[in-house]
């Protein structure tokens, strides 16, 4: 039986730079100016090295009840804003957008408690397909 968790998974899929990974985790779990933080289950497991979002969805390693899967892939590690891939696990599994790490708390908090829908964030991305908060 697969264990289920209440917090949202942040899965590392790029193992090329440990310090960049640590920077992503620090930025993604930092408290916002409003006092909120993403409630993440940080998953640093080499069996997910190079895994695609589709493969991660199929794996469902304890996150089958989560609303969203956060993926720290190469782009998230190399970009200064750390745009984490947000993958829908609800209405349209596999649909995705990116969110800068400093705004992840808003996505995670609101999707976890079903205060907002995935589409509300996905439709609010900038021209480069990255969510940087509501403006």
State the predicted function of each range.
Residues 124-135:
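Short linear, low-complexity motifs centered on an aromatic residue
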Residues 2-119, 134-135:
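Short helix/strand-capping turn motifs
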């Amino acid at each position: 039986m697969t264990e289920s968790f209440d917090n949202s998974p942040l899965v590392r899929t790029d193992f090329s730079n440990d310090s960049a990974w640590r920077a992503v985790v620090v930025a993604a779990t930092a408290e916002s100016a409003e006092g909120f933080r993403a409630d993440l289950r940080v998953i640093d497991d080499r069996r997910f090295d190079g895994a695609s979002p589709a493969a991660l969805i199929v794996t469902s390693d304890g996150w089958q009840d989560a609303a969203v899967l956060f993926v720290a892939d190469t782009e998230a590690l190399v970009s200064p804003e750390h745009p984490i891939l947000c993958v829908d696990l609800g209405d349209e599994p596999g649909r995705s957008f990116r969110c800068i790490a400093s705004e992840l708390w808003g996505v995670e908090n609101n999707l976890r408690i079903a205060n907002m829908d995935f589409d509300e964030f996905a439709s609010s991305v900038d021209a480069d397909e990255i969510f940087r908060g509501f403006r």
